[in-house]
Amino acid sequence: MRGPAMRLPPRIALSALARGPSCILGSGAATRKDWQTRNRRGFSDFNIEPLPDSDLEESSPWTSRNRSEPTRHIACKKAARNLVRDLLEHQNPSRQIILECNPGPGILTGALLKAGARVVAFESEKTFIPHLEPLQRNMDGELQVVHCDFFKMDPRYQEVVRPDVSSQAIFQNLGIKAVPWSAGVPIKVFGILPYKHERRILWKILFDLYSCESIYRYGRVELNMFVSEKEFRKLIATPKRPDLYQVMAVLWQVACDVKFLHMEPWSSFSVHTENGHLEKSKHGESVNLLKQNLYLVRMTPRRTLFTENLSPLNYDIFFHLVKHCFGKRNAPIIRHLRSLSTVDPINILRQIRKNPGDTAARMYPHDFKKLFETIEQSEDSVFKWIYDYCPEDMEF
């Protein structure tokens, strides 16, 4: 049974996740002050340390600068053929919509069209558009070109992107319609994450996915993304690699079937810059960063992600639960529960078959989801979650 629900604008919910103490309002929530006046079970105060910004952050603005960031494109025809195989698999290509992000010279675009696929190319650089449009000639597939940066589409909250691009308007013009979450994959997206903004983009997509916003309004959109080895290792991390296991790994693995497809050497890619050459930054080597092998990862949203107890209406509380537990990852999980929830932690842990001494670092992604859903369906208390009121977070 779900308790009373109190909702805040998305800005507040996201702000709560991006900062220190918890400020979550959701299904069945009460302030810590109110709860402590009623507390009769001896709950201890267990204040967590805020997560570092590199792990959990709001998608802060990264709008267009005066100089465009370098972009990588497929430059090898053999690599393009392999990607066509990975993207189309054994499906009828004419029924599959492929959204290609920043195709550049169109090496992969041409290979997809030759295979008979329907391709929507989202190209941010005007320079490449005249080279993409003629590709449809003498091809079996269908091509539509959209001049926009896919990764900056549907900016969240206070981000300002020019031009302001809405997936809803674009998809409507393309004739793409939403399908139920329980249906198959309606759209596949292929892209190469910008090396300077990989983590930020992955977080932005996570919020879109759990809230069913942006491209996820249209169903279980499948991502096929080239990422750096660093982010790849973190995406697939488990408790067996505590040095890499973080909040992002839990949230992605709960939401999606994350599958490694293959590694592609850096020589398969070309690099485009606005001024035609790469410049070394003050602290690093831009050239060396771009000359790294990339890992192709498929992220397919799970049909079973949303349940009666985890939905786009309360996902922010789930995010907060995971964040809280990783704030002190080596503390017993029972201590986190006593700080997070009003329900009996011993009873909850017994139901999910976990020991009170188990730590967040030893819990697998599915354990966190099971823990959250068990608390949500508990009838021990009307108010299931405790939050701290933070006036500085109550901003739009």
Curated annotation (Swiss-Prot):
Start and end residues of each stretch annotated as Disordered: 43-71
InterPro entries: KsgA/Erm, rRNA_Ade_methylase_Trfase_N, SAM-dependent_MTases_sf
Compartments where found: Mitochondrion
SUPFAM superfamilies: S-adenosyl-L-methionine-dependent methyltransferases (SSF53335)
Principal place of residence: mitochondrion
Tissue expression summary: Ubiquitously expressed.
Keyword GTP-binding tagged: no
One biological process term in Gene Ontology: transcription initiation at mitochondrial promoter
SMART domains attached to this UniProt entry: rADc (SM00650)
Amino-acid positions noted as binding S-adenosyl-L-methionine in the UniProt annotation, renumbered to this chain: 74, 123, 149
MF terms (GO), sorted A to Z: mitochondrial transcription factor activity; RNA binding; rRNA (adenine-N6,N6-)-dimethyltransferase activity; rRNA (adenine-N6-)-methyltransferase activity
Span list, region DNA-binding: 328-329
Catalytic activity: adenosine in rRNA + S-adenosyl-L-methionine = N(6)-methyladenosine in rRNA + S-adenosyl-L-homocysteine + H(+)
The enzyme's E.C. designation: 2.1.1.-
PROSITE patterns (UniProt xref): SAM_RNA_A_N6_MT
Known function: S-adenosyl-L-methionine-dependent rRNA methyltransferase which may methylate two specific adjacent adenosines in the loop of a conserved hairpin near the 3'-end of 12S mitochondrial rRNA. Component of the mitochondrial transcription initiation complex, composed at least of TFB2M, TFAM and POLRMT that is required for basal transcription of mitochondrial DNA. In this complex, TFAM recruits POLRMT to a specific promoter whereas TFB2M induces structural changes in POLRMT to enable promoter opening and trapping of the DNA non-template strand.
Subunit structure: Homodimer. Component of the mitochondrial transcription initiation complex, composed at least of TFB2M, TFAM and POLRMT. In this complex TFAM recruits POLRMT to the promoter whereas TFB2M induces structural changes in POLRMT to enable promoter opening and trapping of the DNA non-template strand. Interacts with mitochondrial RNA polymerase POLRMT. Interacts with TFAM.
Record-linked PANTHER family: DIMETHYLADENOSINE TRANSFERASE, DIMETHYLADENOSINE TRANSFERASE 2, MITOCHONDRIAL
Protein family (similarity comment): Belongs to the class I-like SAM-binding methyltransferase superfamily. rRNA adenine N(6)-methyltransferase family. KsgA subfamily.
This protein's name: Dimethyladenosine transferase 2, mitochondrial
Species name: Mus musculus
Gene name linked to the record: Tfb2m
